[in-house]
């Protein structure tokens, strides 16, 4: 007996670099930490056995899990983690978010997977991380308008700037895989591999961009001006090394 589910495997969006290969925009994985407290299995005997194992190990380990998670996320207390976990356990929730307002980094997620029960395979222990790729700009607002953005950091729909202009190059092609359950074992099969997006190297020089932005901000303040635009071009090649378009906000800053 087996069941099969089609799963979309998202392509990794390409990075955007400056002319010296410094990362301007990149995709970083973050994880929503979840726990499945209710075992799902059509085989009633297997389900009962698996549920008993998960429940008993959880109750034996919940204090250790709470202590371990507090060590990984010191802004949250052991009491918080135990209370949150016990609430999900008592309600037999699946996809129960352990930290509803916090996305874990890859390293934090890996540390959580070392804890009791959490170290088990998701189908056995119930713990898993729902991965979301976030677009990050290591240099913050530097060249932000030129680089553009997505509608949401976790979304893959380009909104403006280079993200939109070169979306067909950056976005890649999603793949499809099957998650197949044969009796009590699950196996992943890739039907069509995801093709990651291509990276984009720009002519922007992050150091020149930084200097240009600081210079125009200083002049806007000095002249009490409303708007300033700077374009720095290399005369020999025509390469644009910096683009700055600054205006005052509603507060006059």
Where are each of the predicted segments found?
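Residue-level preference for non-acidic, small/hydrophobic
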Residues: 21, 111-112, 146, 212, ...
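Extracytoplasmic
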Residues: 9-12, 19, 26-32, 124, ...
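Short pre-catalytic segments that frame enzyme active sites
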Residues: 1-8, 26-52, 181-196, 206-253
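Generic structural detector for well-ordered beta-strands
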Residues: 201-203
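Core beta-strand residues in small-molecule sensory/regulatory alpha/beta domains
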Residues: 17-18, 233
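Catalytic-histidine neighborhood of serine endopeptidases
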Residues: 35-80
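Small/polar-residue-rich segments within soluble enzyme cores
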Residues: 27, 64-74, 80-196
